[in-house]
Amino acid sequence: MHDKTWSGRFNEPVSELVKQYTASIGFDRRLAEWDIQGSLAHAQMLKETGVLDEGDLADIRRGMAEILEEIRSGKIEWSSDLEDVHMNIERRLTDKIGDAGKRLHTGRSRNDQVATDIRLWLRDQITVIRSLIQSLQTALLDLAEQNAETVMPGFTHLQVAQPVSFGHHMLAYVEMLGRDNERMADCRCRVNRMPLGAAALAGTTYPIQREITAELLGFEQICQNSLDAVSDRDFAIEFTAAASLVMVHLSRLSEELILWMSPRFGFIDIADRFCTGSSIMPQKKNPDVPELVRGKSGRVIGHLIGLITLMKSQPLAYNKDNQEDKEPLFDTADTLIDTLRIYADMMRGVTVKPDNMRAAVMQGFATATDLADYLVKKGMPFRDAHEVVAQAVRHADEAGVDLSELPLEVLQGFSDLIADDVYGVLTPEGSLNARNHLGGTAPEQVRFQVKRWREMLA
């Protein structure tokens, strides 16, 4: 038997260099279990349409069960001479059961076979990812609930802007991850379309019934155009784009954790098990996990660009270029799953330092907007109030104190609308409580959102 299933057409064997260059078994063998799933469903359909008999189907099932056990136990020997996971499994099956193994590929091409395998694999990865996103959301909700009344500076341009609740800040990431989860679910709808039956590119002359295979494999839809079915990698790009957004969100949170852990901020501490030391500086405690997440986000974004570039100039239908879709896709899923898993654990190891957060609020005139709103509510036009408060801030800055520390007579020098009730809005806590509306940072709203999200995730 030839090593290649297609070698009868050629007058000379493929060179060893070409074998090494074109073989994909080194990475696509991770699709083996899904390849077997697809083959078993295909065999069942061929039997129901009269292409295979009951004996062939029984032999195929028995042989595939043995191969699956060999794969799971690590006993199977993969051969680069057979190029890919599909040919390796088919050869092993034929060695075990003879002619029935040769009949399995009837009405099928590796083109629709690999497209099916990838979709089956990716569908399962998305299920895992969605569960891990929800686990991370739960960890963030725990932090938010514990810190509904913990005041911290909210920033714009990385400058102190207004007081916010630390719980409210954590909820912002819960919202981002909620959108990420929605995108993954939406992406899965398009992943869950079956290309099997498209064969090489034009369909097959055998009396196949694709509906049978789709039902057996749990596909909700069937790809309706054979050319598109074998050449489509939109679903891979879409998944990588969704994964990139998750990583971008985690990279943003990582940047904040890194800053907040710095002694210059001192807002939080991260448990020792997520940090490392220095080989030369004994005092160092480095936030390696969030730093790596920040770095790995670029890796995933790079895979997105790579996949888009891979597809941009391909004519219909299948081209060998598409062999290059798997490694970035595999690495994207692996990186995202590992990141989500470690991140949820890490967030449970975050210790909040409320006193340091409140002290930072007091250093940045964070309640200046509250003073302007106070004046507006007493009848002053907002633009005039803005100017009055700006003058008060300049005075407080020169005096080295916070607005709340200015004597009443000094504040009244800027506007006679100011009375002794002003100090109720100048404290960080007063600022938080004043924003008690849907989506606001008031502790009551934080608790409402935590409850809402817990119900959604239940």
Curated annotation (Swiss-Prot):
GO terms for cellular component: cytosol. It comes from the Bacteria. Pathway: Amino-acid biosynthesis; L-arginine biosynthesis; L-arginine from L-ornithine and carbamoyl phosphate: step 3/3. Pfam families: ASL_C2, Lyase_1. Keywords: Amino-acid biosynthesis, Arginine biosynthesis, Cytoplasm, Lyase. GO terms for biological process: arginine biosynthetic process via ornithine; L-arginine biosynthetic process. It is an enzyme of class 4 (lyase). It is found in: Cytoplasm. Its EC number is 4.3.2.1. It catalyses: 2-(N(omega)-L-arginino)succinate = fumarate + L-arginine. One of its GO terms (molecular function) is argininosuccinate lyase activity. InterPro entries: Arg_succ_lyase_C, Argininosuccinate_lyase, Fumarase/histidase_N, Fumarate_lyase_CS, Fumarate_lyase_fam, Fumarate_lyase_N, L-Aspartase-like. PROSITE patterns: FUMARATE_LYASES (PS00163). NCBIfam families: argH. Belongs to the lyase 1 family. Argininosuccinate lyase subfamily. PANTHER family: ARGININOSUCCINATE LYASE. This is Argininosuccinate lyase. It comes from Neisseria meningitidis serogroup C / serotype 2a (strain ATCC 700532 / DSM 15464 / FAM18).
